[in-house]
Structure formats: structure tokens, C-alpha cells
Amino acid sequence: MVICCAAVNCSNRQGKGEKRAVSFHRFPLKDSKRLIQWLKAVQRDNWTPTKYSFLCSEHFTKDSFSKRLEDQHRLLKPTAVPSIFHLSEKKRGAGGHGHARRKTTAAMRGHTSAETGKGTIGSSLSSSDNLMAKPESRKLKRASPQDDAAPKVTPGAVSQEQGQSLEKTPGDDPAAPLARGQEEAQASATEADHQKASSSTDAEGADKSGISMDDFTPPGSGACKFIGSLHSYSFSSKHTRERPSVPREPMDRKRLKREMEPRCSGNSVAQSPPSSSLTATPQKASQSPSAPPTDVTPKPAAEAVQSEHSDASPMSINEVILSASGACKLIDSLHSYCFSARQNKSQVCCLREQVEKKNGELKSLRQKVSRSDSQVRKLREKLDELRRASLPYLPYLSGLLPPSHEPPKLNPVVEPLSWMLGTWLSDPPGVGTFPTLQPFQYLEEVHISHVGQPMLNFSFNSFHPETHKPMHRECGFIRLKPDTNKVAFVSAQNTGIVEVEEGEVNGQELCVSSHSVSRISFAKEPHVEQITRKFRLNSEGKLEQTVSMATTTQPMTQHLHITYKKVTP
């Protein structure tokens, strides 16, 4: 999978540039506060980041990264928040408005050419239509951003065309005013059709100022559509309501006369037929010699078109914008509320997903706990059964479970051996040596108990120290002759040896040696001939055992030594 940047209009992806030139960083999904800050900075609608969402390092300032070596991967600080997004947005906005202006200019050129074509109906009306069409076409060419390549018309050429048109239309012709009236009616009808077509086009696409409704209306938002309509109302409603109900045709003729008279003032030919409608408009104050010169600075096509439609109104577009500034501020605040509400909705959705995930994990943990409780309940039932059975071969259960009845009293005969009672574990591991064996270590567990009889029960169970596999095992009884210190040690081993050892107990020390040794017929050689044992309770309360033995090939030699610590009484 190729890692890409999740920012809008960012084309950075893994492997696109030089190595380590751009790094990618995951969204902090586990930190809810920091995740909300990242989402506010990215400003993506109806989008929720996942564990595969990244932002490239170009959206973070230099102080957002921790100081590391050059060959190490860049690491964000725990408080880093992306903040660099405005450059790409400005470039996108500039390109979009330029396209709108070019589109508006091209559309107005097409309408002007169509109007000029409709005006040339007959030979008697051609010269008058030239006077109506050429100022407008020249005005549009001057307002177009591509006016450098457009041909320019000089005032001399205009005056020459005016003279030719006046020569072709004699002033003493009684039908001339009627022809001019019909021509003006046709021109006004054509212009009305043009206004209807342009208004329908503006309703579908961009308005007169070159700003599209899509700039204020995010998709799928009824509140934003309403706010966008308020925007269009704030720019056009007041201007439309204050526009006078004067017919469009006289205003166009006045504007045409105002533009044509300064250009024709330098010409020596001054023709003013009393029957011509072109001389019926008095000169305005702006055309006086003391008035400032007309601003001929090239303007965008959208402003040129808007100025044509707003010359008849006492308010200019700047005055309209100034009068609507308060409304625009209110509408901008509504816009910010609308977008912030949508961002809050996306944040709530993200937090809701995290809560649902945590609830799922909690549910699985509860299921595991319930299963564990059922297992513990079953184990307790089994232990209760064992306790009720009071099995004699499980003496260690008396230390784990509360007794079902009172433990048996120690027989007074075995009182001198009471220091050996309990469960003992090797600490540290025991050591084994013999001339015919490799030295080794082992773990051992010892159980010495009684059931009220004049004897002790014992079992020795040894294990490997690493694998914990069972090794040597033996069990048996320790008997004490009444009113003496003479002791008999009877044991059976898993190696096939059965022995009887006898000795004496002196305080907390017991020494016994083999009295008879028996073995199975297929026991391993060399056979054991004699065994001695010594048990002692040291000053630390630990039990020590030392075992020596003699075989058919070796004399009496120490074989085992181990120390036990008591774990249960």
C-alpha cells in the first residue's frame, strides 16, 4: 500500500520525492483532544481518519519536530498540530476566479455579436446600428483582460463613421424619425431578450460579481444553501429595489450620447439635425470641461458587465457592498457556525466509534471473566468432593482446604520425630556425585505426615531442575520403638530396591543405615550393597539430608546432599 497525504489538494505520496525529503505521520487516533485539533486543521467534510490515514511533513512547522540525527526518521512532538494549508487554497481560489472572468467575458462577447447581427436588418438601418453597437463592443474590448491583442478604434475613425452614417440618412426625409423609432424599438427588444438570457445564465452559474454560489454552498447542507441565498440577497437585493422604473432604451441612448460626444468634439464636422433623437439628451455635469477625465483603466470583464447594468441606478457597486457589509459579517458568522457544526458532527462520529470499540472490548473481557468464574466454580466443586472423600494418599490437601473434621492427634510414640513433620521443598537444588556417575543437580519435594498411628508416612519425589521431569521416587514409613530412641526406616524405590534401615534419633538428628537390601532380578548393575542416611534440622529451621552408598565396585561414598525448607506444617 502506498502512503498518501490526507490533506486536500496535496499530492505527496511515499516514494514520490527524494528519500527523507517528505515524511508521513499517522493521525493521533488514541489522543482524542489532539485528534480534534488535527481534524479542525485539515477541514475535510464527512471524513473520518483511520489507522491508514497520514499527513505529510509539509503541513507542519519546523518546531513541530523533535531534534534528531539527520539519518533518523523525523518524529513529531506530542503537541504538534498541522497548520500549513493556506498556500494551496490561495492558488486554487485564484485559478477558479480567473476562469470565471474568462467565461463571463466570452459569454458577453457572444451576446454582443448576436445583438449586432440582429440589428443589421436593412441597408437603411445599418449606419444607425453601427452607432449603437460599436461603442458597446469597444467598451467590452477595453474591459476584457485580453485587450492587448484586440484591435483599438480611434476617435477619428468614430467621427468618420458618424459622418458617413449622417450623410447616408438625409435630415429632410420625413420618414427618418419613424425609421429611427422602429430601429430603437427593435434594439430595445433585442436587449431585453439578452437581459433575460444573461439573467437565466447567472441564476444557473455565477452571479454578476463573478462569484459562484458553490463557493458559499457546501454540498448536502440545507443551512448552507440558505446562507448562500442570503449572500446573493445582500449584494443584489437592495440595488434591485432602489433601481428606478425608467425604460432601458432612453438610458442606453443617453449613455451612448455621453460616450460619443467627447470623441466627436475634436472633429470640425458638427452636424445636429433638429429631427435626430441623438441630440435630444442634454449634456451631463460630468462632461463639462472642469470635470475630471474619465477613468480608462482596464477593468475585469465581470466588473465591466456589472457597470453597464448599474449605470442607470443612483448607487454604484461599491456603495452597495459598503451598505451590505454588516449583513455580510452576519452571514460570515453563520457560515462559520455551519462549518463548525459539521466539524463537531464528524468529531462526535469519531468519538462514538471509539466508544463503541471500547464497549466491545469490555464485553469480551466480561465474557472471559464469566468463563473464568465458571471454571473456578467447577474446581471448587471437585475440591469439595475430594475433601469429603478424605483420601489418605493426598495428605497435602489438609494444608489447602479447611478440614472437614479435626486433624488426628499425634501419637505420643512418634513425638521425638515431630520436627520432621510437614512438606519440604529443596532450597537450593540438591547435588549428586559418585565415581561411576557424572555430577548432577536435582529438585526434590518431601512429604512427612501422620494419621494418628505410631509411625510417620514419608514420600520423596525428585525432578530435573530444567525440564522438571520426574526422576527418583521412594516412599515408606518411619517407626519408633516405644520408650526408646531406636528407629526403623522402611522404604521402596522406583529403581527396584526395597531396604530396611535402622538407627537412632538424638534430639533433632536421625542417623540410619541399611539392615537389609533387596532388589528385583533385573536391576541394573553395579548393585547397591549398603546405604546410610542422616537427617538434621539446622539452626535456620531447614532440613538437611545426606545419603551415602556402597556398590559391588565402589566402597562407601557420599552420593547425595540436599537442603529443604518447610512450606506447610
Swiss-Prot record:
Region (Nitrobindin): 407-569
Main localization of the protein described in the UniProt heading: cytoplasm
Residue interval(s) of motif HCFC1-binding motif (HBM): 230-233
Any one of the GO BP annotations: tyrosine metabolic process
Catalytic activity: peroxynitrite = nitrate
Gene, per the UniProt record: Thap4
Name of the featured protein: Peroxynitrite isomerase THAP4
Feature: compositional bias, Low complexity: 280-289
Functional note: Heme-binding protein able to scavenge peroxynitrite and to protect free L-tyrosine against peroxynitrite-mediated nitration, by acting as a peroxynitrite isomerase that converts peroxynitrite to nitrate. Therefore, this protein likely plays a role in peroxynitrite sensing and in the detoxification of reactive nitrogen and oxygen species (RNS and ROS, respectively). Is able to bind nitric oxide (NO) in vitro, but may act as a sensor of peroxynitrite levels in vivo, possibly modulating the transcriptional activity residing in the N-terminal region.
Zinc finger map (THAP-type): 1-85
Co-factor binding comment: Binds 1 heme b group per subunit, that coordinates a highly solvent-exposed Fe(III) atom.
Cofactor: heme b
Cellular component, GO annotation: cytosol; nucleoplasm
